[in-house]
C-alpha cells in the first residue's frame, strides 16, 4: 500500500518563488488603477481614533531616482503603513521642489546662445516644462517602490496656488518686521552668479596660499606706542581680498609685542611664529592691544589707511593675532566694522568673481598696475597680488584645507557683500523674543529619532547668521515687493501684498515679469504706479520648501493631515536644510514648530562604508535592484537596516537580504499550506502549542513596540529570529507528524493548526508595512480561516495574540539542544539515520508528566521513558537530571516512520486508527 496517499500533506497555490521582478509591476498597476488602494486606505480608517501623516520633504524635480531617494521614500512608506496597519487614519501626499538653479542650468545648457533671444517668462516656461517632465518620471519610479500615496494630487512648488502661498508666507514674515534688506557679505557663487544660503554650501578640500604681510604703522600709531618704526603683521589665506582691506582687528585686552625686527605680534603666538622663522622672538616692547585702537597702519598695496579695531572674533589659536579685516569679504569683518561705524564697505568684485572698476574708483591698487587687474578673476589674481607685496611679504606657503563650494556648480564660493534680503535672527519682534530664541525653544517640544538630532539642529540654530533668502536668478518665486523710486523703501501694505498673491493664484508668479507695476498694483492702494519699481530678486529654494507646511497643511488644496505635521523624515543633512528652513518659517509666522517628530536617516554607502560614485563602480541603482531582485528585497533591506547611521548596500548584501526574504516567504507558505482545511480556530491547546503561542505573543508584542517606536531593524530581527529559530526550527518541524499523520480532526492536529492560524493572522499585518507586495499576494491565496472578511492586505489590522501562556520550558529546551548535539555526532558516526529510531530516557519527573506523545515529539523521538539501567548510545545531564539515548526496540511504522509498531511491516496504533477511519 502507498501510505503517501493517506497522509494530509500541505496544499497551497501560494508559490514558493515570488518571481518579484515580474509580478510586482502587475500588482502595482492593480493597486493604483483598479483597486484605488490609497482611497481605500482613507475610507477604511475614516472613523479611527488616531490620525497620522508624514509631511513629505520634496525631492528635486530633476533626474532619475538614486538609492538615497529609495531609502527615504520606502522608510516614509513603512512608517505610514505601520500606523495604518495599527488601525490609524493616515495621509501621505508626496511633493516636489520645482524651482532653483539646477533646473535653470539644465535649460541654459539646452538653449546655449539662444537664451539671449528669450524673455524671462519664456525661460521660466522651459524650466517649468523640464520640472514637469521629471516629476512624471519620478512619480512612476516612486510608485514602483511600493509607495502608496496621493500621487494623483501631489504638491508641486511651481503650481500657481503654491507659488501664491509661498509668497504669502514671505509677506507674513515681512509684516512681523523680520524681513530686512541690507548690504552684507554672503556666500556668493561666482559660477552661478548668485547668493547662496548655508544649506547650499558643501565643503571640499582646496589648496590655498598662506601669507604673512607687514603693514607699516602711520605716525599717529607710532607716537601712541612711542617707537620710530613698527609693522603690524597679518596672516591671510585669501591674498585677493587684500586690496579691499579696511582694518586690522586685535583681541581686546591682549598683550602684544614689538620684536627686534620691528614686527608686531600677539604675545601668546610668539613661540609658534619663531618656529615659522618670522622672528627671532626678541621683544623690544610689550603693550595692551587697546593702545592701538582707532589708530592706523598702511596697506602696502595701495597706501590706504587700515584702522586698528578690537574684536572678540580674534582668536589665539593661529596666525599672528592681527586679523586682516575686509568687511566686504567676511562676516566677522563686516560686523566689527559695522560696530565701529564704517560708512563704506569696499567691494571690488563683480558677480562673476572678476575685479571690477571699483579697484580704480577707490584706488585699491597702485595706478601703474590697476588696469591689468580689472576684469581678472580673483583666484587668478592671487600670485600677482603676492608679487606686488614685495618686501612686505614676510612668508608664503601653500596648504590644503576644507573650503566652501557651491552645491550645484561645485566651484569654490567667496564671501561678497551685496544688497540682499534677510530674515533676521536676532530682532526681538516675536512677543519680545528673537526668531533664534523662539526657534530654539520650540525644538524642546519636538521628539527626535535618533535623540541626538536635537543637538545637531539646536547648535545650528544657535550659531547660524541671518538667513539670506534672495537670489539673482530667473527660475523661482519672486520677492514680489514694490519699492518707492525716490527712497528705495519697500512697501508691505497688506492690501497690495494680497492683491499680488491673488494674481499669482490665477496666473502664476510669471505675472511679476509679464505684468506692469500698474497692472499689479491693487486698486485704491494709495500709491501711484509711476512712483514705484519692482524688486526683481527671487527666493532661495529653501524658503520654498521651508514654507510647504503652510501651502500644504494649512490650505484646502490638499488632504495631507494637519499642522503641525506628525513627522518630518529626511536624511541627516536636512538638519541644516529642510528641517531648519521649515522651523524658521513656521516660528517666524506662528511661533510654533511645524512638526511634532523629526526622524533622520543616514546615507547609503557600499559594503565597505565608502560613498557611492560612478568612478568607483559601486553605485547601486534602485531600478537595477527592482529588475534583478524585486522591490520587496529593497524594502526588506530598509526594514532590516539601522537607519540611524549610514546604510550599507551592495550585491552581496542584497543576496543576504534575498535569503532572509526566502525564509519568510517559505515559512508563510508552510503555514498557509497546513491550515487549508481548518474551519474554526480552537481555544484548547496542547503544551507545545501553548509554548509557541506564548513565544509568539512575547515576540510580536516586543516587535510591535519596536515598530511603533520606528526601530524597524530591531523589530524585524526579532521576528526573523522567531520565524527561523522557534517557529520553523522547532515548532513546525515537530508538528509535521501530527499535521500529516493524525486524523484530520484530531485534537492535536486542530490545536496545532489553530496555533498556526493565530500566528499567521497576527504576523501578516505586522510585516505588511514593509513586505506589502508579499502580504497582498498572500491574501490572494490565503484560506478563509486566515482572511476572514478581508479581501486584500489593506483590509488587515494588527491584533495582538491574546493567548498569554507562560510555559516553563527551560529544562525542556536546554535538554533538547544538548540532545541534538549528541545526535549530530551519532549521525556523523553513522550509528543512526533518524531520531525516530530512538527512545530518550530521563530522570526528570517534570518532563515525564507531559503528554507521552507531546514529549516524544519535542525531541522528535519515538518515545520518552523513565531513566533505566539499559545501555545507551550516549547520555548527558542538565540541572541534575539525567538523560540517556537508547535505540527503540519497537518496529518502524511504514506510514509515519515512528518506531511504535508492534510487528514489523504493520502500522502503529495511531496510524491504524486513522486508516480504519478513512476506509
Curated annotation (Swiss-Prot):
HAMAP family: Ile_tRNA_synth_type1
Domain notes per entry: IleRS has two distinct active sites: one for aminoacylation and one for editing. The misactivated valine is translocated from the active site to the editing site, which sterically excludes the correctly activated isoleucine. The single editing site contains two valyl binding pockets, one specific for each substrate (Val-AMP or Val-tRNA(Ile)).
EC number, UniProt record: 6.1.1.5
Positions occupied by motif 'KMSKS' region: 611-615
Pfam families for this protein: Anticodon_1, tRNA-synt_1
Location of the protein in the cell: Cytoplasm
Binding site for Zn(2+): 893, 896, 908, 911
Lineage summary: Bacteria, Pseudomonadati, Campylobacterota, Epsilonproteobacteria, Campylobacterales
PANTHER family per UniProt: ISOLEUCINE--TRNA LIGASE, MITOCHONDRIAL, SOLEUCYL-TRNA SYNTHETASE
GO biological process entries: isoleucyl-tRNA aminoacylation
The protein's name in its UniProt record: Isoleucine--tRNA ligase
Family: Belongs to the class-I aminoacyl-tRNA synthetase family. IleS type 1 subfamily.
Motif 'HIGH' region, residue numbers: 59-69
Gene Ontology annotations for the cellular component aspect, listed alphabetically: cytosol
Subcellular location, principal: cytoplasm
Keywords from the named record: Aminoacyl-tRNA synthetase, ATP-binding, Cytoplasm, Ligase, Metal-binding, Nucleotide-binding, Protein biosynthesis, Zinc
Amino acid at each position: 500500500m502507498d501510505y503517501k496517499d493517506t497522509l494530509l500533506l500541505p496544499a497551497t497555490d501560494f508559490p514558493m518563488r515570488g518571481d518579484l521582478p515580474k509580478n510586482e509591476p502587475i500588482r502595482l498597476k492593480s493597486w493604483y488603477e483598479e483597486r484605488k488602494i490609497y482611497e481605500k486606505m482613507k475610507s477604511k480608517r475614516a472613523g479611527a481614533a488616531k490620525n497620522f501623516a508624514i509631511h513629505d520633504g520634496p525631492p528635486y524635480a530633476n533626474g532619475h531616482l538614486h538609492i538615497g531617494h529609495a531609502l527615504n521614500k520606502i522608510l516614509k512608506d513603512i512608517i505610514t503603513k505601520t500606523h495604518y496597519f495599527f488601525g490609524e487614519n493616515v495621509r501621505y501626499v508626496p511633493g516636489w521642489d520645482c524651482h532653483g538653479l539646477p533646473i535653470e542650468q539644465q535649460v541654459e545648457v539646452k538653449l546655449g546662445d539662444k537664451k539671449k533671444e528669450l524673455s524671462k517668462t519664456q525661460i521660466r516656461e522651459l524650466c517649468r516644462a523640464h520640472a514637469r517632465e521629471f516629476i512624471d518620471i519620478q512619480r512612476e519610479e516612486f510608485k514602483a517602490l511600493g509607495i502608496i500615496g496621493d500621487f494623483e494630487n501631489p504638491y508641486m512648488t511651481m503650481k500657481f496656488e503654491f507659488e501664491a502661498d509661498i509668497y504669502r508666507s514671505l509677506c507674513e514674515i515681512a509684516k512681523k518686521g523680520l524681513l530686512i534688506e541690507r548690504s552684507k557679505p554672503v556666500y556668493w557663487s561666482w559660477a552661478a552668479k548668485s547668493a547662496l544660503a548655508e544649506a547650499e554650501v558643501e565643503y571640499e578640500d582646496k589648496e590655498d596660499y598662506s601669507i604673512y604681510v607687514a603693514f607699516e604703522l602711520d605716525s599717529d600709531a607710532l607716537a601712541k606706542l612711542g617707537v620710530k618704526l613698527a609693522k603690524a603683521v597679518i596672516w591671510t589665506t585669501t591674498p585677493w581680498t587684500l586690496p579691499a582691506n579696511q582694518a586690522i582687528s586685535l583681541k581686546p585686552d591682549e598683550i602684544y609685542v614689538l620684536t627686534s625686527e620691528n614686527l608686531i605680534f600677539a604675545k601668546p603666538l610668539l613661540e609658534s611664529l619663531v618656529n615659522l622663522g618670522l622672528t627671532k622672538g626678541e621683544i623690544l616692547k610689550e603693550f595692551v592691544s587697546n593702545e592701538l585702537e582707532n589708530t592706523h597702519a598702511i596697506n602696502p598695496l595701495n597706501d590706504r589707511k587700515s584702522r586698528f579695531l578690537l574684536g572678540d572674533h580674534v582668536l589665539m589659536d593661529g596666525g599672528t593675532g592681527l586679523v586682516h579685516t575686509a568687511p566686504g569679504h567676511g562676516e566677522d569683518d563686516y560686523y566689527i566694522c559695522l560696530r565701529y561705524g564704517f560708512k563704506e564697505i569696499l567691494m571690488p568684485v563683480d558677480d562673476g568673481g572678476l575685479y571690477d572698476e571699483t579697484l580704480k574708483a577707490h584706488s585699491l591698487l597702485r595706478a601703474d598696475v590697476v588696469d591689468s587687474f580689472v576684469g581678472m578673476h580673483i583666484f587668478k589674481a592671487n600670485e600677482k597680488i603676492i608679487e606686488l607685496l614685495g618686501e612686505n611679504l614676510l612668508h608664503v606657503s601653500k596648504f590644503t584645507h576644507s573650503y566652501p563650494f557651491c552645491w550645484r556648480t561645485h566651484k569654490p564660493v567667496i564671501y561678497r557683500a551685496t544688497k540682499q534680503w534677510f530674515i533676521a535672527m536676532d530682532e526681538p519682534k516675536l512677543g519680545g523674543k528673537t526668531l533664534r530664541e523662539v526657534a530654539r525653544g520650540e525644538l524642546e517640544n519636538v521628539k527626535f529619532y535618533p535623540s541626538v538630532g536635537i543637538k545637531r539642529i539646536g547648535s545650528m540654530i544657535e550659531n547660524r547668521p541671518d538667513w539670506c533668502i534672495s537670489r539673482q536668478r530667473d527660475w523661482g518665486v519672486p520677492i514680489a515687493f514694490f519699492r518707492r523710486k525716490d527712497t528705495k523703501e519697500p512697501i508691505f501694505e497688506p492690501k497690495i501684498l494680497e492683491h499680488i498673491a491673488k494674481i499669482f493664484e490665477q496666473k502664476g508668479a510669471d505675472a511679476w515679469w509679464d505684468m506692469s507695476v500698474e497692472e499689479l498694483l491693487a486698486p485704491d492702494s494709495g500709491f501711484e504706479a509711476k512712483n514705484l519699481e519692482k524688486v526683481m530678486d527671487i527666493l532661495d529654494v529653501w524658503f520654498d520648501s521651508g514654507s510647504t507646511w503652510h501651502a500644504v497643511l494649512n490650505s484646502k488644496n490638499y488632504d495631507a493631515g494637519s499642522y503641525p505635521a506628525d513627522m518630518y523624515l529626511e536624511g541627516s543633512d536636512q538638519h541644516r536644510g529642510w528641517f531648519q528652513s521649515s522651523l524658521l518659517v513656521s516660528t517666524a509666522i506662528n511661533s510654533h514648530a511645524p512638526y511634532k517628530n523629526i526622524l533622520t536617516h543616514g546615507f547609503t554607502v557600499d559594503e565597505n562604508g565608502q560613498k557611492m560614485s560612478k568612478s568607483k563602480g559601486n553605485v547601486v541603482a534602485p531600478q537595477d535592484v527592482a529588475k534583478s531582485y524585486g522591490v520587496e528585497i529593497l524594502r526588506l533591506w530598509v526594514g532590516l537596516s539601522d537607519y540611524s547611521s549610514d546604510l550599507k548596500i551592495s550585491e552581496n548584501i542584497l543576496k543576504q537580504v534575498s535569503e532572509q526574504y526566502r525564509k519568510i516567504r517559505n515559512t508563510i507558505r508552510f503555514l498557509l499550506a497546513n491550515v487549508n482545511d481548518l474551519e474554526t480556530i480552537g481555544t484548547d491547546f496542547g503544551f507545545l502549542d501553548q509554548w509557541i503561542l506564548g513565544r509568539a505573543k512575547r515576540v510580536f508584542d516586543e516587535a510591535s513596540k519596536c515598530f511603533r517606536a520606528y526601530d524597524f531593524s530591531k523589530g524585524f530581527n526579532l521576528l526573523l529570529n522567531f520565524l527561523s529559530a522557534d517557529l520553523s526550527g522547532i515548532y513546525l518541524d515537530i508538528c509535521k507528524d501530527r499535521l500529516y499523520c493524525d486524523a484530520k480532526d484530531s485534537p492535536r492536529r486542530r490545536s496545532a493548526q489553530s496555533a498556526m492560524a493565530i500566528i499567521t493572522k497576527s504576523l501578516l499585518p505586522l510585516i505588511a508595512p514593509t513586505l506589502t507586495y508579499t502580504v497582498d499576494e498572500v491574501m490572494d491565496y490565503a484560506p478563509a480561516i486566515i482572511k476572514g472578511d478581508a479581501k486584500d492586505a489593506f483590509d488587515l489590522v494588527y491584533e495582538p495574540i491574546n493567548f498569554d501562556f507562560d510555559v516553563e520550558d527551560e529544562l525542556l529546551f536546554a535538554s533538547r539542544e544538548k540532545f541534538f548535539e549528541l545526535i549530530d555526532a551519532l549521525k556523523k558516526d553513522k550509528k543512526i539515520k533518524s531520531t525516530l529510531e530512538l527512545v530518550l530516557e530521563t530522570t526528570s519527573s517534570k518532563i515525564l508528566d507531559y503528554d507521552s506523545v507531546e514529549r516524544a515529539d519535542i525531541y522528535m523521538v519515538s518515545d520518552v521513558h523513565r531513566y533505566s539501567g539499559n545501555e545507551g548510545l550516549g547520555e548527558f545531564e542538565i540541572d541534575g537530571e539525567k538523560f540517556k539515548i537508547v535505540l527503540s526496540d519497537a518496529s518502524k511504522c511504514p506510514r509515519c516512520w515512528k518506531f511504535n509498531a508492534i510487528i514489523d511491516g504493520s502500522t502503529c496504533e495511531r496510524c491504524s486508527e486513522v486508516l480504519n477511519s478513512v476506509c
